[in-house]
């Protein structure tokens, strides 16, 4: 919950508390807030253990499904496309195509189909164009 608060933010909170509450009431306010946080944490851990007891093995299944949902929420659109539509092959995005050997016969087949004819082919005559 407070994992993102660093020492700098904590120092700012203490200074603001010192200015607002004064030096005589600040220790009591700190004790009260730490006690309230401790009670909230104990309450939440009690609720979690009660849910685990009531639901049994379904609780672990629910936590697994919620974990998968959290992984999907953290995916970027590119990662979602790569995983679900392209089966993890991201060469379309990176440009690293490893199957260059299979592309060369197709190029040769196209080149043989487009060989020059024996006689030159003239475009049809259009009387309106002249």
From Swiss-Prot:
Protein localization: Cell membrane
Protein name per UniProt: Sec-independent protein translocase protein TatB
InterPro entries registered for this protein in UniProt: TatA/B/E (IPR003369), TatB (IPR018448)
Keyword Transmembrane: yes
Task of the protein: Part of the twin-arginine translocation (Tat) system that transports large folded proteins containing a characteristic twin-arginine motif in their signal peptide across membranes. Together with TatC, TatB is part of a receptor directly interacting with Tat signal peptides. TatB may form an oligomeric binding site that transiently accommodates folded Tat precursor proteins before their translocation.
Annotated keywords: Cell membrane, Membrane, Protein transport, Translocation, Transmembrane, Transmembrane helix, Transport
Statement: the UniProt record of this protein carries the keyword Zinc: no
GO molecular function, one term: protein transmembrane transporter activity
Cellular component, GO, one term: TAT protein transport complex
Known partners and oligomeric status: The Tat system comprises two distinct complexes: a TatABC complex, containing multiple copies of TatA, TatB and TatC subunits, and a separate TatA complex, containing only TatA subunits. Substrates initially bind to the TatABC complex, which probably triggers association of the separate TatA complex to form the active translocon.
Spans through the membrane: 2-22
Principal location listed in the UniProt entry: membrane
Organism: Mycobacterium ulcerans (strain Agy99)
Highest taxon in the source lineage: Bacteria
Family: Belongs to the TatB family.
Signal peptide residue numbers: none
A Pfam family assignment: TatA_B_E
Membrane topology qualifier: Single-pass membrane protein
Alphabetical GO biological process terms: protein transport by the Tat complex
